[in-house]
């Protein structure tokens, strides 16, 4: 791929600092710190570029409200590449206001109502449309220049994802990176012992679909008495539903509508029903791939993989995306969206946009990507020197490929942003969960009051219809 920085030609003088930013990011994770490091040969730092900063106004400080700080927590801690670029190349600063994850939205509302300064806020699914309708966030369309949207090669692969978040003709969410995909972990050794095909090879040959997935689980569990083996455990209801490529709530740019009756959604729900009815699913919580040889697949985000490897060092684990619907032409991936929101009434829109652009550069710069890979592949060892957590290079490269938007469509259903009646875990019961949680959980879990798609559909339909009506007013 042609380097994003090599193709920025004939840019205006106002974008000169952008070019310098690329130089700084390429060394942000390859130069050693000048002091305070335990290992000066590997500890990264940044290089200050002597280019005139872009004028963001005075002061150039933006206020960040979140449950985590973007700034280093100690003098010895390296700055993230995006923050280093924002500070060194643009003269920016990030002022942190701490709050808890459960209180962030409440704190934001309190600050807005009090007229207190807050500029930037973490993205989560409640931002659009709920947060926008509560006048908590502002669109970023007026600061596209500061975002670098016109720089060839910088945002090209994210433009489809960005457009999927467009609301009322405006862009409130500008994802700069995808991460943490839902995926399936399996053991190649176990597959060979059971004379089953390698799912990764099936995926590479475009044969990894629901039908093959079910056939493998049924064959695996049929060899011993029922309930002794399981086809799958972990968290996969949402990934299965979204592998259809269909949304529960549709948006045409003006109005929302229910898509609950879509045949693909019905097929996904019937598949969950079938998995539960055939006792293929083990609902008992697991934090990693089971090491007893009694489960074929483990579904989770990528956070579990390092522990799974450590607990199964001889099982040759590998990961694949969730299988696509049998009649689908493309894989749809459920993953995290990395974005920062511009808070309503902020006077620092250009500063927030410039920070987001720095995040995008950090997500694209090859030196940064190489350093991130090196960190991910560094095993964490116990005091005895045995691996406690590790990821192989093959696994890492595969995960990154599953986030490639030319091969996968990132799922985005506005239903998850339409309030607690639609998206909430409640008290983890059928009566307190949101409609989306019941759609992705109820037919899989034991002792739920519904055991068929028809009953579940009739229960969630009026909830979905009522919330859509409220948002369309």
Task: Label each region the model flagged.
Residues 141-156, 202-205, 247-267, 325-331:
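Short, solvent-exposed loop/beta-turn-alpha elements that line the ligand-binding surface or hinge
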Residues 121, 166-184, 192, 206-257:
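Extracytoplasmic/periplasmic solute-binding protein
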Residues 44-58, 102, 125-181, 211, ...:
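Hinge/lid segment of periplasmic solute-binding proteins
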Residues 310-382:
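Extracytoplasmic/periplasmic substrate-recognition and gating elements
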């Amino acid at each position: 791929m042609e380097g994003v920085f090599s193709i920025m030609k004939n840019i205006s003088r106002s974008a000169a600092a952008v070019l310098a930013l690329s130089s700084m990011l390429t060394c942000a994770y390859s130069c050693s710190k000048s002091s305070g490091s335990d290992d000066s040969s590997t500890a990264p730092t940044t290089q200050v570029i002597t280019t005139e900063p872009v004028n963001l106004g005075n002061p150039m400080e933006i206020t960040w409200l979140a449950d985590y700080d973007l700034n280093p927590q100690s003098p010895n801690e390296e700055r993230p590449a995006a923050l280093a670029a924002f500070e060194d190349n643009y003269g920016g600063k990030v002022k942190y206001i701490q709050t808890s994850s459960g209180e962030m939205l409440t704190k934001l509302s309190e600050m807005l109502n009090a007229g207190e300064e807050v500029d930037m806020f973490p993205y989560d699914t409640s931002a659009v449309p709920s947060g926008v309708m509560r006048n908590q966030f502002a669109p970023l369309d007026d600061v596209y220049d500061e975002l670098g949207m016109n720089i060839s090669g910088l945002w090209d692969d994210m433009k489809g994802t960005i457009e999927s978040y467009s609301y009322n003709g405006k862009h409130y969410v500008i994802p700069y990176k995808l991460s943490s995909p839902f995926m399936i972990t399996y053991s190649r050794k176990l597959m060979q012992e059971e004379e089953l095909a390698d799912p990764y090879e099936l995926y590479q040959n475009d044969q990894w679909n629901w039908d093959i997935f079910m056939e493998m689980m049924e064959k695996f569990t049929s060899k011993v008495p029922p309930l002794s083996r399981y086809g799958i455990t972990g968290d996969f209801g949402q990934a299965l539903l979204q592998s259809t490529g269909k949304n529960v709530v549709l948006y045409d740019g003006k109005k929302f509508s229910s898509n609950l009756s879509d045949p693909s959604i019905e097929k996904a729900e019937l598949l969950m029903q079938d998995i539960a009815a055939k006792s293929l699913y083990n609902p008992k919580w697991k934090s990693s791939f089971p090491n007893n040889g009694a489960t074929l697949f483990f579904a989770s985000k990528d956070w579990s993989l390092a522990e799974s490897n450590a607990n199964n060092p001889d099982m040759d684990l590998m990961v694949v995306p969730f299988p696509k619907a049998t009649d689908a032409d493309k894989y749809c991936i459920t993953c995290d969206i990395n974005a920062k929101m511009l808070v309503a009434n902020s006077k620092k829109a250009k500063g927030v946009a410039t920070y987001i652009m720095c995040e995008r550069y950090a997500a694209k710069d090859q030196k940064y990507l190489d350093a991130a890979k090196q960190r991910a592949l560094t095993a964490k060892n116990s005091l005895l020197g045995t691996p406690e957590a590790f990821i192989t290079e093959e696994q890492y490269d595969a995960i990154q490929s599953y986030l490639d938007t030319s091969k996968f469509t990132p799922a985005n259903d506005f239903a998850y942003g339409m309030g607690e009646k639609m998206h909430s875990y409640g008290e983890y019961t059928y009566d307190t969960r949101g409609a989306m949680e019941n759609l992705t959980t109820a037919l899989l879990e034991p002792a739920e009051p519904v055991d068929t798609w028809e009953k579940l559909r009739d229960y969630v339909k009026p909830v979905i219809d009522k919330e859509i009506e409220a948002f369309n007013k």
